[in-house]
């Protein structure tokens, strides 16, 4: 399906065309449709389809960007399997670039669903959603360019996260990254295999993957435009499957663990979009791709691991593995001398407990940087909130036999203590330049919500893109 913007209404009333009208509840109440719709019990909240007119009415409380974005998804979903090839969409109110972008992005992201493993799928009749801009209020070319690039990146990230673990191994992610660099053209790709990881002394990363028959990979994608204003390095947790290791997860908790690679997939999606948009920011995406499995060679609670930074780590829980992969990747990332360093990870269930399944957690030492990222995230349509570090929780990761322990000694504050663990491996010169984004909640939800399908949402991609674009304007 594609989206477009038209400066005149081409609706001819033919059988393959439909219309959608988006309006606020207050406007609906005064509209000529109100009396008819109310006779069918529709009071102006949600959507109502007038079949004879092939007209979908979509009513929202007010025409804010979040409501418009979600309405775009609702329109696309409604017509997804109906026998209409194109839908003309009109917004009853002033149109501008941000509203047009929100509606069309919502449509492209809302229509996505993972059907790769179904043997029978309903046909997608809908070919195009056309936004009407009769007053010529929208910079159509730039809006459409960004919409298509961002939507494609998010949907590709969703698809690779949804890819099953028997297919999506660390080698698979590495192959995908190589193909991505060739497709985009202005991306470079470097892959570190097991031998290279040993030379890099990534003892924590390697320990996590030890019991897997699928070897680990570190993936390094880079976008280096001439005269770049800043260098931003992104790090993503790429656990292609996580059974918990010897600290084995309960069976119900293992389901959906194919999504433990969401952070790694997100940073690939972000750099792809940034490169295609031609942003004047140098960006690197580093993905630690591994599997946390069980076996005679598995790393164990009571082990002490040595990280690339030289710090020793007492292992008390092998299911706190993502942070072990991340610390070695963050060490590698700091060698690139970033102006800003951000990691994305489905790191803790505790973050979901703290913020719910629709909101990501932002952590770090720089309040201004955290506020900037949260602002960009909210503008992109992603819910994020700051979780504050504190000295009391830091004491929970102290170890009596090593430099630091991989889990806190309390059942409380797990999202923050995990962030504080990562902070132990951030060099002093980068403390104020680093952010940790825990996307454990929204990365994979087993129900449709907002503009997201059941399954992978592509959490972090839109927020990361907007943040980097904002840095280019700063």
Curated annotation (Swiss-Prot):
A single GO BP term for this record reads: proteolysis
Note the CDD domains from the entry: Peptidase_M17
UniProt cross-references to InterPro entries, sorted A to Z: Leucine_aapep/pepB (IPR011356), Macro_dom-like (IPR043472), Peptidase_M17_C (IPR000819), Peptidase_M17_leu_NH2_pept (IPR023042), Peptidase_M17_N (IPR008283)
EC numbers: 3.4.11.1, 3.4.11.10
Instruction: Note how many cofactor molecules are bound and how.
Output: Binds 2 manganese ions per subunit.
- Report TM segments: none
Alphabetically sorted, this entry's keywords are: Aminopeptidase, Cytoplasm, Hydrolase, Manganese, Metal-binding, Protease
Q: Active-site positions, per UniProt?
A: 249, 323
Q: Which cofactor does it need?
A: Mn(2+)
The Swiss-Prot or TrEMBL record annotates one GO molecular function as: metalloaminopeptidase activity
Q: Name one GO cellular component term.
A: cytoplasm
Family membership, please give it: Belongs to the peptidase M17 family.
Write out the function statement from the record: Presumably involved in the processing and regular turnover of intracellular proteins. Catalyzes the removal of unsubstituted N-terminal amino acids from various peptides.
The UniProt entry, under PANTHER family, shows: CYTOSOL AMINOPEPTIDASE, LEUCINE AMINOPEPTIDASE-RELATED
Name used for this protein in its record: Probable cytosol aminopeptidase
Gene name as annotated: pepA
């Amino acid at each position: 399906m594609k989206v477009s913007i038209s400066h005149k209404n081409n609706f001819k009333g033919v059988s393959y065309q439909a219309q959608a009208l988006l309006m606020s509840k207050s406007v609906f109440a005064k509209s000529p449709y109100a009396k008819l719709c109310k006779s069918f019990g529709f009071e102006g909240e949600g959507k109502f389809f007038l079949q004879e007119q092939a007209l979908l009415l979509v009513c929202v409380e007010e025409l804010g960007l979040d409501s418009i974005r979600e309405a775009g998804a609702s329109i696309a979903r409604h017509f997804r399997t109906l026998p209409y090839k194109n839908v003309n969409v009109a917004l009853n109110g002033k149109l501008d670039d941000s509203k047009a972008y929100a509606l069309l992005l919502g449509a492209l992201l809302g229509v996505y669903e993972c059907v790769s493993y179904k043997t029978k799928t309903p046909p997608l009749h809908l070919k195009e959603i056309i936004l009407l801009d009769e007053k010529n209020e929208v910079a159509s070319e730039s809006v459409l360019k960004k919409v298509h690039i961002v939507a494609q990146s998010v949907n590709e990230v969703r698809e690779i996260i949804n890819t099953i673990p028997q297919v999506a191994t660390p080698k698979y992610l590495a192959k995908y990254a190589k193909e991505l660099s060739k497709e985009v053209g202005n991306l470079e790709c470097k892959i570190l295999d097991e031998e290279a990881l040993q030379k890099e002394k990534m003892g924590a990363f390697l320990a996590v993957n030890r019991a897997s028959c699928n070897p680990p990979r570190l993936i390094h994608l880079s976008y280096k435009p001439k005269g770049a204003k800043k260098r931003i390095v992104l790090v993503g947790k790429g656990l292609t499957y996580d059974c918990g290791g010897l600290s084995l997860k309960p069976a119900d908790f293992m389901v959906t663990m194919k999504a433990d690679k969401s952070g790694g997939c997100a940073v690939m999606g972000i750099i792809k979009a940034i490169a295609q948009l031609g942003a004047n920011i140098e960006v690197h995406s580093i993905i630690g791709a591994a599997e946390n499995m069980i076996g005679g060679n598995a790393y164990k609670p009571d082990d002490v691991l040595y990280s690339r930074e030289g710090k020793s780590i007492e292992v008390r829980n092998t299911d706190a593995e993502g942070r072990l992969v991340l610390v070695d990747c963050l060490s590698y990332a700091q060698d690139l001398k970033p102006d800003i360093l951000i990691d994305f990870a489905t790191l803790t269930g505790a973050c979901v407990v703290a913020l719910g399944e629709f909101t990501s957690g932002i952590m770090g030492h720089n309040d201004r940087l955290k506020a900037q990222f949260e602002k960009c995230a909210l503008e992109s349509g992603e819910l994020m909130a700051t979780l504050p570090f504190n000295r009391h929780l830091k004491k929970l990761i102290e170890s009596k036999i090593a430099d630091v322990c991989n889990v806190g000694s309390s059942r409380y504050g797990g999202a923050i203590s995990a962030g504080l663990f990562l902070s132990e491996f951030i060099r002093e010169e980068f403390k104020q330049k680093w952010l940790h984004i825990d996307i454990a909640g929204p990365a994979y939800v087993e129900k449709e919500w907002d503009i997201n399908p059941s399954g992978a949402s592509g959490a972090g991609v839109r927020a990361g893109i907007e943040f980097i674009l904002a840095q280019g304007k700063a």
